Protein backbone atom coordinates (compact mmCIF):
# COMPACT_ATOMS: atom_id res chain seq x y z
CA UNK A 1 0.00 0.00 0.00
CA UNK A 2 1.40 3.40 -1.03
CA UNK A 3 2.30 5.66 1.87
CA UNK A 4 0.60 9.05 1.95
CA UNK A 5 2.85 12.10 1.78
CA UNK A 6 1.47 14.96 3.85
CA UNK A 7 2.18 18.67 3.56
CA UNK A 8 1.15 21.50 5.89
CA UNK A 9 -0.35 24.78 4.77
CA UNK A 10 -0.17 27.61 7.30
CA UNK A 11 -2.75 30.26 6.40
CA UNK A 12 -3.10 33.80 7.66
CA UNK A 13 -4.77 37.02 6.60
CA UNK A 14 -2.08 38.83 4.63
CA UNK A 15 -0.27 42.13 4.46
CA UNK A 16 0.73 44.87 2.02
CA UNK A 17 4.05 44.33 0.25
CA UNK A 18 5.31 47.75 1.34
CA UNK A 19 4.28 50.59 3.70
CA UNK A 20 3.22 52.79 0.78
CA UNK A 21 -0.21 54.14 -0.21
CA UNK A 22 -0.08 52.21 -3.49
CA UNK A 23 0.75 48.86 -1.87
CA UNK A 24 -1.77 49.39 0.92
CA UNK A 25 -4.45 50.31 -1.62
CA UNK A 26 -3.88 47.06 -3.55
CA UNK A 27 -4.05 45.05 -0.36
CA UNK A 28 -7.14 46.77 1.04
CA UNK A 29 -8.94 46.46 -2.29
CA UNK A 30 -8.50 42.69 -2.29
CA UNK A 31 -9.29 42.35 1.41
CA UNK A 32 -12.39 44.54 1.43
CA UNK A 33 -13.70 43.00 -1.79
CA UNK A 34 -14.16 39.60 -0.12
CA UNK A 35 -17.83 38.96 0.67
CA UNK A 36 -16.76 37.04 3.76
CA UNK A 37 -15.32 40.31 5.11
CA UNK A 38 -17.91 42.80 3.85
CA UNK A 39 -21.20 41.36 2.60
CA UNK A 40 -22.89 44.65 1.71
CA UNK A 41 -24.65 44.82 -1.66
CA UNK A 42 -22.01 45.23 -4.37
CA UNK A 43 -24.06 48.01 -5.98
CA UNK A 44 -23.64 50.02 -2.79
CA UNK A 45 -20.21 48.78 -1.76
CA UNK A 46 -18.14 49.16 -4.94
CA UNK A 47 -18.62 52.93 -5.35
CA UNK A 48 -18.01 53.48 -1.62
CA UNK A 49 -14.91 51.27 -1.58
CA UNK A 50 -13.31 52.62 -4.73
CA UNK A 51 -14.42 56.22 -4.52
CA UNK A 52 -14.14 56.94 -0.79
CA UNK A 53 -12.56 54.26 1.39
CA UNK A 54 -9.50 53.32 -0.66
CA UNK A 55 -8.46 56.90 -1.56
CA UNK A 56 -8.90 58.14 2.02
CA UNK A 57 -7.70 55.15 4.07
CA UNK A 58 -4.71 54.00 2.02
CA UNK A 59 -2.38 56.95 2.81
CA UNK A 60 -3.34 56.95 6.50
CA UNK A 61 -2.96 53.19 6.90
CA UNK A 62 0.37 53.29 5.03
CA UNK A 63 1.74 55.65 7.68
CA UNK A 64 0.63 53.26 10.41
CA UNK A 65 2.36 50.36 8.67
CA UNK A 66 5.51 52.44 8.27
CA UNK A 67 5.58 52.98 12.05
CA UNK A 68 5.86 49.21 12.72
CA UNK A 69 7.61 48.01 9.54
CA UNK A 70 10.56 45.68 10.13
CA UNK A 71 13.73 45.03 8.16
CA UNK A 72 12.26 41.87 6.64
CA UNK A 73 8.84 43.34 5.88
CA UNK A 74 5.63 43.80 7.80
CA UNK A 75 5.57 42.22 11.27
CA UNK A 76 2.92 39.71 10.21
CA UNK A 77 5.05 38.54 7.29
CA UNK A 78 8.26 38.40 9.32
CA UNK A 79 6.71 36.38 12.13
CA UNK A 80 4.72 34.16 9.75
CA UNK A 81 7.88 33.26 7.83
CA UNK A 82 9.60 32.51 11.13
CA UNK A 83 6.70 30.23 12.08
CA UNK A 84 6.88 28.43 8.73
CA UNK A 85 10.63 27.92 8.97
CA UNK A 86 10.54 26.81 12.60
CA UNK A 87 7.73 24.32 11.96
CA UNK A 88 9.61 22.95 8.95
CA UNK A 89 12.66 22.43 11.18
CA UNK A 90 10.48 20.75 13.80
CA UNK A 91 8.97 18.43 11.13
CA UNK A 92 11.87 17.90 8.71
CA UNK A 93 10.12 15.18 6.69
CA UNK A 94 7.02 17.31 6.08
CA UNK A 95 6.82 20.18 3.56
CA UNK A 96 5.43 23.36 5.14
CA UNK A 97 4.06 26.20 3.01
CA UNK A 98 2.75 29.63 3.94
CA UNK A 99 -0.22 31.24 2.20
CA UNK A 100 -2.21 34.41 2.76
CA UNK A 101 -5.86 35.06 2.00
CA UNK A 102 -4.92 38.47 0.62
CA UNK A 103 -1.64 39.66 -0.81
CA UNK A 104 1.49 37.58 -1.19
CA UNK A 105 2.33 34.72 -0.88
CA UNK A 106 -1.13 33.65 -1.97
CA UNK A 107 -2.93 30.53 -0.82
CA UNK A 108 -2.77 29.28 -4.40
CA UNK A 109 1.02 29.62 -4.50
CA UNK A 110 1.20 27.70 -1.22
CA UNK A 111 -0.96 24.87 -2.60
CA UNK A 112 1.14 24.73 -5.77
CA UNK A 113 4.32 24.66 -3.68
CA UNK A 114 3.06 21.63 -1.77
CA UNK A 115 1.83 19.85 -4.91
CA UNK A 116 5.27 20.38 -6.45
CA UNK A 117 6.58 18.36 -3.49
CA UNK A 118 4.22 15.55 -4.62
CA UNK A 119 2.09 15.60 -1.49
CA UNK A 120 -1.24 13.80 -1.71
CA UNK A 121 -2.61 15.09 1.59
CA UNK A 122 -2.59 18.67 2.90
CA UNK A 123 -3.30 19.68 6.49
CA UNK A 124 -4.60 23.25 6.41
CA UNK A 125 -4.00 25.22 9.60
CA UNK A 126 -5.58 28.69 9.51
CA UNK A 127 -3.72 30.63 12.19
CA UNK A 128 -6.91 31.96 13.75
CA UNK A 129 -7.42 30.27 17.13
CA UNK A 130 -11.11 31.23 17.20
CA UNK A 131 -13.24 30.42 14.15
CA UNK A 132 -14.99 33.22 12.30
CA UNK A 133 -16.68 33.22 8.92
CA UNK A 134 -14.64 36.31 8.00
CA UNK A 135 -11.26 34.62 8.59
CA UNK A 136 -11.35 30.82 8.64
CA UNK A 137 -14.38 30.84 6.34
CA UNK A 138 -12.48 32.99 3.85
CA UNK A 139 -9.60 30.47 3.81
CA UNK A 140 -12.06 27.64 3.18
CA UNK A 141 -13.69 29.53 0.30
CA UNK A 142 -10.40 30.36 -1.41
CA UNK A 143 -9.09 26.83 -0.98
CA UNK A 144 -12.25 25.48 -2.63
CA UNK A 145 -11.80 27.88 -5.56
CA UNK A 146 -8.17 26.84 -5.96
CA UNK A 147 -8.90 23.11 -5.91
CA UNK A 148 -11.83 23.52 -8.30
CA UNK A 149 -9.26 24.41 -10.97
CA UNK A 150 -7.17 21.26 -10.40
CA UNK A 151 -7.63 18.01 -12.35
CA UNK A 152 -6.29 16.02 -9.42
CA UNK A 153 -6.79 17.21 -5.87
CA UNK A 154 -5.07 16.04 -2.69
CA UNK A 155 -6.82 14.86 0.42
CA UNK A 156 -7.56 17.80 2.69
CA UNK A 157 -7.70 18.01 6.47
CA UNK A 158 -8.95 21.43 7.55
CA UNK A 159 -8.47 22.57 11.15
CA UNK A 160 -11.48 24.74 11.97
CA UNK A 161 -9.96 26.32 15.08
CA UNK A 162 -8.13 25.57 18.30
CA UNK A 163 -9.73 27.92 20.82
CA UNK A 164 -9.50 25.46 23.71
CA UNK A 165 -6.47 23.44 22.62
CA UNK A 166 -4.48 22.47 25.72
CA UNK A 167 -1.07 23.38 24.28
CA UNK A 168 -2.37 26.72 22.99
CA UNK A 169 -3.87 27.65 26.35
CA UNK A 170 -0.69 26.64 28.18
CA UNK A 171 1.46 28.70 25.81
CA UNK A 172 -0.75 31.74 26.40
CA UNK A 173 -0.69 31.17 30.16
CA UNK A 174 3.09 30.92 30.24
CA UNK A 175 3.37 34.13 28.22
CA UNK A 176 1.11 35.91 30.71
CA UNK A 177 3.07 34.55 33.67
CA UNK A 178 6.32 35.81 32.14
CA UNK A 179 4.81 39.27 31.70
CA UNK A 180 3.53 39.30 35.28
CA UNK A 181 6.98 38.28 36.52
CA UNK A 182 8.61 41.07 34.53
CA UNK A 183 6.15 43.91 35.14
CA UNK A 184 4.27 42.86 38.27
CA UNK A 185 0.75 41.44 38.43
CA UNK A 186 -1.72 44.03 37.10
CA UNK A 187 -5.04 45.11 38.52
CA UNK A 188 -6.66 43.64 35.41
CA UNK A 189 -5.72 41.35 32.52
CA UNK A 190 -7.58 42.49 29.42
CA UNK A 191 -7.96 40.01 26.55
CA UNK A 192 -8.65 41.89 23.33
CA UNK A 193 -9.96 39.96 20.32
CA UNK A 194 -10.51 41.26 16.81
CA UNK A 195 -14.14 42.24 16.42
CA UNK A 196 -16.72 41.23 13.83
CA UNK A 197 -20.09 42.83 13.06
CA UNK A 198 -22.68 41.81 15.64
CA UNK A 199 -24.93 40.84 12.74
CA UNK A 200 -22.54 38.04 11.74
CA UNK A 201 -22.86 36.52 15.20
CA UNK A 202 -26.64 36.96 15.12
CA UNK A 203 -26.67 35.03 11.83
CA UNK A 204 -24.77 32.06 13.25
CA UNK A 205 -21.05 32.83 13.43
CA UNK A 206 -19.94 31.26 16.72
CA UNK A 207 -16.85 33.47 16.99
CA UNK A 208 -17.90 35.21 20.24
CA UNK A 209 -18.52 31.85 21.89
CA UNK A 210 -15.08 30.65 20.80
CA UNK A 211 -13.50 33.80 22.24
CA UNK A 212 -15.33 33.23 25.51
CA UNK A 213 -14.03 29.65 25.53
CA UNK A 214 -10.42 30.81 25.22
CA UNK A 215 -10.95 33.48 27.87
CA UNK A 216 -12.47 30.99 30.30
CA UNK A 217 -9.77 28.37 29.75
CA UNK A 218 -6.94 30.90 30.04
CA UNK A 219 -8.34 32.39 33.26
CA UNK A 220 -8.65 28.87 34.67
CA UNK A 221 -5.07 27.98 33.70
CA UNK A 222 -3.84 31.16 35.38
CA UNK A 223 -6.05 30.56 38.43
CA UNK A 224 -7.21 34.17 38.21
CA UNK A 225 -10.48 35.40 39.66
CA UNK A 226 -13.07 36.13 36.93
CA UNK A 227 -13.26 39.79 37.91
CA UNK A 228 -9.54 40.20 37.17
CA UNK A 229 -9.87 39.04 33.54
CA UNK A 230 -11.90 41.00 30.98
CA UNK A 231 -12.70 40.24 27.33
CA UNK A 232 -13.11 43.04 24.77
CA UNK A 233 -13.17 43.47 20.98
CA UNK A 234 -11.04 45.77 18.85
CA UNK A 235 -10.57 47.05 15.28
CA UNK A 236 -14.19 47.82 14.41
CA UNK A 237 -14.80 49.21 10.94
CA UNK A 238 -17.83 50.98 9.50
CA UNK A 239 -21.01 52.18 11.14
CA UNK A 240 -22.95 49.05 12.06
CA UNK A 241 -22.63 47.62 15.60
CA UNK A 242 -19.75 45.22 16.23
CA UNK A 243 -19.17 42.81 19.09
CA UNK A 244 -18.96 44.61 22.41
CA UNK A 245 -17.50 45.77 24.70
CA UNK A 246 -15.08 47.76 22.54
CA UNK A 247 -11.44 47.68 23.64
CA UNK A 248 -10.73 51.40 23.32
CA UNK A 249 -13.91 52.50 25.10
CA UNK A 250 -13.31 49.95 27.88
CA UNK A 251 -9.75 51.16 28.46
CA UNK A 252 -10.96 54.75 28.65
CA UNK A 253 -13.64 53.77 31.16
CA UNK A 254 -11.18 51.78 33.28
CA UNK A 255 -8.70 54.65 33.38
CA UNK A 256 -11.43 57.06 34.42
CA UNK A 257 -12.57 54.65 37.17
CA UNK A 258 -9.11 54.63 38.72
CA UNK A 259 -7.78 51.26 37.56
CA UNK A 260 -4.04 51.84 37.69
CA UNK A 261 -2.26 48.90 36.06
CA UNK A 262 -3.45 46.91 33.05
CA UNK A 263 -1.80 44.29 30.88
CA UNK A 264 -3.33 43.49 27.49
CA UNK A 265 -3.04 40.30 25.49
CA UNK A 266 -4.58 39.53 22.07
CA UNK A 267 -5.14 35.74 22.12
CA UNK A 268 -6.76 35.72 18.67
CA UNK A 269 -3.59 36.85 16.90
CA UNK A 270 -1.08 34.08 16.23
CA UNK A 271 1.48 36.65 15.08
CA UNK A 272 2.00 40.29 15.92
CA UNK A 273 0.79 42.69 13.26
CA UNK A 274 -0.50 46.23 12.77
CA UNK A 275 -3.55 45.61 14.96
CA UNK A 276 -1.45 44.50 17.92
CA UNK A 277 1.75 46.52 17.64
CA UNK A 278 0.18 49.83 16.64
CA UNK A 279 -3.48 49.74 17.67
CA UNK A 280 -3.08 47.91 20.99
CA UNK A 281 0.52 48.55 22.05
CA UNK A 282 0.49 52.23 21.06
CA UNK A 283 -2.95 53.77 20.40
CA UNK A 284 -4.79 52.05 23.22
CA UNK A 285 -1.93 52.62 25.63
CA UNK A 286 -2.41 56.35 25.04
CA UNK A 287 -6.16 55.97 25.57
CA UNK A 288 -5.70 54.27 28.95
CA UNK A 289 -2.95 56.54 30.25
CA UNK A 290 -4.75 59.62 28.95
CA UNK A 291 -7.85 58.61 30.92
CA UNK A 292 -5.93 58.38 34.19
CA UNK A 293 -4.34 54.93 34.07
CA UNK A 294 -0.82 54.63 35.46
CA UNK A 295 0.78 51.55 33.93
CA UNK A 296 0.06 49.65 30.71
CA UNK A 297 1.83 46.73 29.05
CA UNK A 298 1.08 44.79 25.89
CA UNK A 299 1.87 41.06 26.07
CA UNK A 300 3.25 40.01 22.66
CA UNK A 301 1.65 37.36 20.47
CA UNK A 302 3.08 33.86 20.59
CA UNK A 303 4.80 34.45 17.23
CA UNK A 304 7.55 31.84 16.62
CA UNK A 305 8.25 30.93 20.24
CA UNK A 306 9.21 27.31 20.82
CA UNK A 307 5.99 26.62 22.72
CA UNK A 308 3.90 27.96 19.85
CA UNK A 309 5.74 25.88 17.26
CA UNK A 310 5.41 22.77 19.43
CA UNK A 311 1.68 23.47 19.72
CA UNK A 312 1.39 23.67 15.91
CA UNK A 313 3.34 20.43 15.48
CA UNK A 314 1.13 18.61 17.97
CA UNK A 315 -2.02 20.08 16.45
CA UNK A 316 -1.30 19.04 12.87
CA UNK A 317 -0.07 15.61 14.00
CA UNK A 318 -3.62 14.67 14.91
CA UNK A 319 -4.71 15.24 11.29
CA UNK A 320 -1.83 13.57 9.41
Curated annotation (Swiss-Prot):
GO molecular function per UniProt: ferrochelatase activity; metal ion binding
Keywords of this entry: Cytoplasm, Heme biosynthesis, Iron, Lyase, Metal-binding, Porphyrin biosynthesis
TM annotation in the entry: none
InterPro entries according to UniProt: Ferrochelatase (IPR001015), Ferrochelatase_AS (IPR019772), Ferrochelatase_C (IPR033644), Ferrochelatase_N (IPR033659)
One GO CC annotation: cytoplasm
Main location: cytoplasm
Signal peptide: none
Annotated Fe cation binding sites: 194, 275
Protein role: Catalyzes the ferrous insertion into protoporphyrin IX.
Family: Belongs to the ferrochelatase family.
Protein name, entry field: Ferrochelatase
Gene source species: Escherichia coli O127:H6 (strain E2348/69 / EPEC)
